[in-house]
Amino acid sequence: MSDAGDQSPVLAVRITLLMTASLAVMAGAIVSPSLPALEQHFSHIPRIDYLSRFIITVPSLFMAILAPFAGYVIDTFGRRKLLIGGILLYAAAGVGGAMFDSITAILISRAFLGISTAAIMTTVGTLVGDYFSGAPRNRFMGYRNASNNFGGVIYLVLGGFVATLDWRAPFFIYLVALAILPMVLKFIAEPPRDVSPGGNAGGGRVIPIPWLEIGWVYFAAFIFGVTFYMIPTQVPFYLGELGFADPALSGVGVAASTLSTAITALFYGRIRRHVGIETMLIFGFGLSAIGFFAMGLANALPLLFLGLLLFGAGQGSTTANFSIRLLELAPYHVRGRIMGGQASAVMMGFFISPLLSQSIAKTSSLSVAFFTGALLLLTVSMMFGLRRIVRRPEART
């Protein structure tokens, strides 16, 4: 990464990775406050109530499909070139949503946004494994999660306010990627192919890949994706049902959950000194379930916002564990593919989320959709609890 004695480049690399990682967070949710206005603009389109949600989730589908391929490219050809290309495509595809008056064309541009985000998300996760190990990796993952969500707060609130001007306005925020690109060009170097400070190059040995353990992580990441994306896709409409249709308030509501995640994530590295990954997952999924249950009960703003804050705090205790555990399990030569699999699991959850939640909302209500999400989260928490009982003592890594 840089000379260990030169702290400035090290800090610059960390800041660059944090800023680049935040692009994945804003890929879908940045335009969520403008969804009701977009739906009204295209009200003549059949089933626009579903199609409007796809504005957010089509990127997730293409991320889910292409993230493993991005991981293969990373393992085969390296990290840096794919990251640079992903950022350029991200800016072009993101702003493209503002240039069309066709829902089909907008969805196509969102597909390319998903392709670019798959490259960015997988590459950044792999680079973290290349550059960090042990406690420093835990701390950086916590900071990355916090940075992503603090950035998400800024992007979401900004998106909510500019959406009051025009539903197209939030799409221009994607151009922030072009401001990050010079930092990537200057500070991100290609890691050596045969040496990984945070990994295991194998030394010529064939290292077994623990696919069962990796599968558990992928499953938890998928459920995380399903429930997480109910916030940007359904909260604006839930607020409307409660009589608060202002897109700015929608942005603040989604940002409240994101801010709660960010604050919790700041303490992740400190908490992990004393608590194992499975305990963090049990607590995080359980707290998120309580948050969703409160949201399902909400008939006024205070309880809804309490639920958003609790859910966000649970996510702040959960998200970093996926990447950290996979980086511990993945040999260096397949690290990109393993991290691509995680991105794929999360993004497939994002894509499934509106299909599941909107179907439930149509047949019953949004309240029932959030109760269903709470049940999914509680199930995962209990599954990790049972695994901990069976596998005592918990391994702390």
Language model segments and positions:
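Central cavity-lining transmembrane alpha-helices of secondary-active solute carriers
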Residues: F54-A70, A255-F267
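Conserved MFS/SLC helix-loop-helix module at the cytosolic interface between two early adjacent transmembrane helices
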Residues: I65-D101
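Helix-to-loop junctions at the C-terminal end of transmembrane segments
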Residues: L66-G78, T264-G276, A361
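Helix-breaking motifs and short loop linkers at transmembrane-helix boundaries and internal kinks
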Residues: G78, M99-T104, S133, L297-N299
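Helix-loop-helix hairpin linking two adjacent transmembrane segments in secondary transporters
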Residues: Y143-A189
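Extracytoplasmic gate region of multi-pass secondary transporters
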Residues: E213-A255
